């Protein structure tokens, strides 16, 4: 149930909010796509924690680049 809710929230962000904001993620795939895939693969707790760590790494001073869900 929590997994479903988090996936719906991420999808809502991707469809309704993200198109209206300038691109700022320095990683490929984007942080929202990473979060969606991590939660889908690992569940709400582990995937959610992986997403939080990824978002914390996404800042202008990081190197960025290709960083897929393991």
UniProtKB/Swiss-Prot annotation:
Key words of the record: Cell membrane, Membrane
Gene Ontology CC: plasma membrane
Record-stated family: Belongs to the UPF0161 family.
Xref: InterPro entries: Membr_insert_effic_factor_YidD
Membrane disposition: Peripheral membrane protein
A Pfam family of this chain: YidD
Subcellular location: Cell membrane
Keyword Nucleotide-binding in annotation: no
Role, per record: Could be involved in insertion of integral membrane proteins into the membrane.
Protein name stated in the entry: Putative membrane protein insertion efficiency factor
Primary location group: membrane
Source lineage: Bacteria, Bacillati, Chloroflexota, Chloroflexia, Chloroflexales
Lineage: superkingdom: Bacteria
Keyword Ligase attached: no
């Amino acid at each position: 149930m929590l997994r479903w809710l988090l996936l719906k929230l991420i999808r809502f962000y991707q469809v309704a909010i993200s198109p209206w904001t300038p691109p700022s993620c320095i990683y490929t795939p984007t942080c929202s796509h990473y979060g969606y895939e991590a939660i889908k693969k690992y569940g709400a707790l582990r995937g959610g924690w992986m997403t939080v760590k990824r978002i914390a790494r996404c800042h202008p001073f990081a190197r960025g680049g290709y960083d897929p869900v393991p």
